[in-house]
Structure formats: structure tokens, C-alpha cells
């Protein structure tokens, strides 16, 4: 098999991810068949899965099946190392956490608990998660048996229609069903900068994702105060440049300059290390995790004088 630019074409496998809500009143299969919720659920799945694999160009949803009360997501993996990264996220619970966080607003829930199961063919991989090599071999043995489902392309077209007229640097789009496209490029394509139809959910609204700017740094540094360290700890989970002892070093180096400069330099280091991956979505999620919703609203330009959302 011919290798792609990054060698991903040499390793292709498939698996099924089963999702079931542990909340009695939430039936995922029913929710996904609701046209008002389908787009938001699809976006939530795409976002969480892309986070877990740390790359959207090697993990692709081929089809979403409804099997009451479950959703069954057929996945295509391209690249052994990144498939291993997905397995690690699944094993350590990071995927479950991401799915619960992303799907809760899509289902109009404040919180959501999910039960997951991972299968490759007849093998239930949950029984072998500590043996990553075995899991990888099972996934590799299951070659994708289909092309990407046409319905998923239609969902992404719908998402683009919702967001294609958003050319500003930020802002939210209020829609009945919130969700967005997370495009999956081929392994040989360079990962593009966030486009207008790459969005994320914030309090049930679609927000256009984009790289962070100098203005974002200033807004963050002006308002975050003592919590800049806590936000840094949230960001450091997926940013090696912020891992210990980086935060302590920043605090010491800029102690005389005050909290504003410490917070400003935190985002500066994040943006330098991550480049175009230092996005508004990642910062907003870190702020929400640390109960700094009002600051997130300021960054999104959604804050009203009375503190509400635009």
C-alpha cells in the first residue's frame, strides 16, 4: 500500500464506538433521529473524537448507526501512533470526559454521563485496553468496509450553511440546533487554518473558532487575575510548553510586573508553542473549566452590560 506524506496510508484500521447515556431520560438513538438535534450531536462527536486523537486528519467517522438506546459510531483510523493515542485517551477516560462535555449542551443537558464500549469486529477491546499492542492489531485487522456515509457529508454542508456568512474574528450564531463542521482532510493535505465553518458550542450557540490574537491576550490578562495559574493548568494538559515547571517559572520571572503580565505571558507562551492550534475554543474551554464564564463571554464579544449573553 502506498504511503502518504506522513506515512499514514501504511496503517489503516476500523473500530466501532458504542455510546449509551447513563441518564434515564436521555436516549441517544432517539435524540440523533431528531432533526433539531442531529447536527449538534454530530458536531459534538467530531469535536470530542478529534480532541482524543489530537489530530483530525487521521480519525474519521464513517457512519453513525442508531441501535436503541445506543449510538454506534464506525471509525476509520489512519496511522498507528495516532490510533494508539486514541486508545490511550479511551483507556484513561479522557475520551469519555470530552464526549460528556461536548454532548451535554447538544442534548440540552447541564451534565451527561455516558457508558462507552469499543469493538473491533467480534472483539470487545475494553477487555484488552492494558494491552495496547493487541488492541492495535485487532483494529488493523478490521479494514474499513465502506466509504464515508453520504448523510455525514450532508450534515457538514448544513453546518457550513449556518456559518459560512461569519467572516468576523469571533461572535456567536444563535440557532435552534447548535453544532459545527470539523472538516477531515486527507493525510497528504496540510492541516488548514481554522475556517469560517469550523465552530464550537458555547451555551447552546455556535461560535466561530479562530487562532488567538493579541486582543485576546490583552482581554484575558486584564480580567483573569489570580486564576491565570488555574487556566494554565487546564491548558497544559495538551500543551507541553506549559507543563511543570513552566507556570512556576512564569510566576517567578514576572512577579514584579504583576498579574497582568503573568497572565499575558502565559497566553504568549501558549500561542508561540501551539501556533495555529492555539485557538479560541481551547481557551474558552479552559476558562469554563475554571468557572470563568464571564471572561469567556468577553472574549466572544457576547457580554451585555447586564452580564447576559448577546
Swiss-Prot record:
Signal peptide boundaries: none
Gene3D superfamilies assigned: Death Domain, Fas (1.10.533.10), TRADD, N-terminal domain (3.30.70.680)
Biological process terms in GO annotation: canonical NF-kappaB signal transduction; extrinsic apoptotic signaling pathway; extrinsic apoptotic signaling pathway via death domain receptors; positive regulation of canonical NF-kappaB signal transduction; positive regulation of cell migration; positive regulation of execution phase of apoptosis; positive regulation of hair follicle development; positive regulation of inflammatory response
Post-translational modification: (Microbial infection) Glycosylated at Arg-243 by S.typhimurium protein Ssek1: arginine GlcNAcylation prevents homotypic/heterotypic death domain interactions and assembly of the oligomeric TNFRSF1A/TNFR1 complex, thereby disrupting TNF signaling.
Disruption phenotype: Mice develop tumors. In a C57BL/6 genetic background, mice exhibit a shorter lifespan than wild-type, but exhibit low incidences of observable tumor formation. In the FVB/N background, which is more tumor-prone, mice show a significant increase in the spontaneous development of a broad range of tumor types.
Localization in the cell: Nucleus; Cytoplasm; Cytoplasm, Cytoskeleton
Membrane-traversing stretches: none
CDD domains: Death_TRADD
Keywords tagged on the record: Apoptosis, Cytoplasm, Cytoskeleton, Glycoprotein, Nucleus
Region (Interaction with KRT14 and KRT18): 220-287
InterPro entries: DEATH-like_dom_sf (IPR011029), Death_dom (IPR000488), TRADD (IPR035712), TRADD_N (IPR009095), TRADD_N_sf (IPR036729)
Record Pfam families: Death, TRADD_N
Motif (Nuclear export signal): 147-163
Glycan attachment points: 243
Coiled coil location: none
Keyword Nucleus: yes
Keyword Cell division: no
Domain annotation Death: ranges: 213-303
Motif (Nuclear localization signal): 229-242
GO cellular component, one term: plasma membrane
An annotated Gene Ontology molecular function: death domain binding
UniProt remark on domains: Requires the intact death domain to associate with TNFRSF1A/TNFR1.
SUBUNIT field: Stimulation of TNF-alpha receptor TNFRSF1A leads to the formation of two distinct signaling complexes. Plasma membrane-bound complex I is composed of TNFRSF1A, TRADD, RIPK1, TRAF2 and BIRC2/c-IAP1 or BIRC3 which interacts with CHUCK/IKK-alpha, IKBKB/IKK-beta and IKBKG/IKK-gamma promoting cell survival. Subsequently, TRADD, RIPK1 and TRAF2 dissociate from TNFRSF1A and form cytoplasmic complex II with FADD and caspase CASP8 promoting cell apoptosis. Within complex I, interacts with TNFRSF1A/TNFR1, TRAF2 and kinase RIPK1.
Function in brief: Adapter molecule for TNFRSF1A/TNFR1 that specifically associates with the cytoplasmic domain of activated TNFRSF1A/TNFR1 mediating its interaction with FADD. Overexpression of TRADD leads to two major TNF-induced responses, apoptosis and activation of NF-kappa-B. The nuclear form acts as a tumor suppressor by preventing ubiquitination and degradation of isoform p19ARF/ARF of CDKN2A by TRIP12: acts by interacting with TRIP12, leading to disrupt interaction between TRIP12 and isoform p19ARF/ARF of CDKN2A.
Record's protein name: Tumor necrosis factor receptor type 1-associated DEATH domain protein
Organism field: Mus musculus
Amino acid at each position: 500500500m502506498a504511503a502518504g506524506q506522513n506515512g499514514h496510508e501504511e496503517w489503516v484500521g476500523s473500530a466501532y464506538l458504542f455510546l449509551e447515556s447513563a441518564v434515564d431520560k436521555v436516549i441517544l438513538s432517539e435524540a440523533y433521529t431528531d432533526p433539531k438535534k442531529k447536527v449538534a450531536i454530530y458536531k459534538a462527536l467530531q469535536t470530542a473524537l478529534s480532541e482524543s486523537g489530537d489530530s483530525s486528519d487521521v480519525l474519521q467517522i464513517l457512519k453513525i448507526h442508531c441501535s436503541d438506546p445506543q449510538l454506534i459510531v464506525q471509525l476509520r483510523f489512519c496511522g498507528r501512533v495516532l490510533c494508539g493515542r486514541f486508545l490511550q485517551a479511551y483507556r484513561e477516560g479522557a475520551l469519555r470526559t470530552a464526549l460528556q462535555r461536548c454532548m451535554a449542551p447538544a442534548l440540552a443537558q447541564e451534565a451527561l454521563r455516558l457508558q462507552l464500549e469499543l469493538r473491533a469486529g467480534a472483539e470487545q477491546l475494553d477487555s484488552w485496553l492494558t494491552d495496547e499492542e493487541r488492541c492495535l492489531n485487532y483494529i488493523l485487522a478490521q479494514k474499513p468496509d465502506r466509504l464515508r456515509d453520504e448523510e455525514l457529508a450532508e450534515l457538514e454542508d448544513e453546518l457550513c450553511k449556518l456559518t459560512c456568512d461569519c467572516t468576523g474574528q469571533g461572535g456567536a450564531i444563535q440557532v435552534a440546533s447548535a453544532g459545527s463542521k470539523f472538516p477531515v482532510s486527507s493525510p497528504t493535505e496540510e492541516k488548514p487554518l481554522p475556517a469560517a465553518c469550523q465552530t464550537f458550542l458555547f451555551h447552546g450557540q455556535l461560535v466561530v473558532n479562530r487562532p488567538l490574537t493579541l486582543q485576546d491576550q490583552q482581554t484575558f490578562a486584564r480580567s483573569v487575575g489570580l486564576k491565570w495559574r488555574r487556566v494554565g493548568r487546564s491548558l497544559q494538559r495538551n500543551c507541553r510548553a506549559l507543563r511543570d515547571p513552566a507556570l512556576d517559572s512564569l510566576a517567578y520571572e514576572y512577579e514584579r510586573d504583576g498579574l497582568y503580565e503573568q497572565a499575558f505571558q502565559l497566553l504568549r507562551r501558549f500561542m508561540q508553542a501551539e501556533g495555529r492550534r492555539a485557538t479560541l475554543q481551547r481557551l474558552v474551554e479552559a476558562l469554563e473549566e475554571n468557572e470563568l464564564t464571564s471572561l469567556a463571554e468577553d472574549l466572544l464579544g457576547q457580554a451585555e452590560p447586564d452580564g447576559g449573553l448577546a
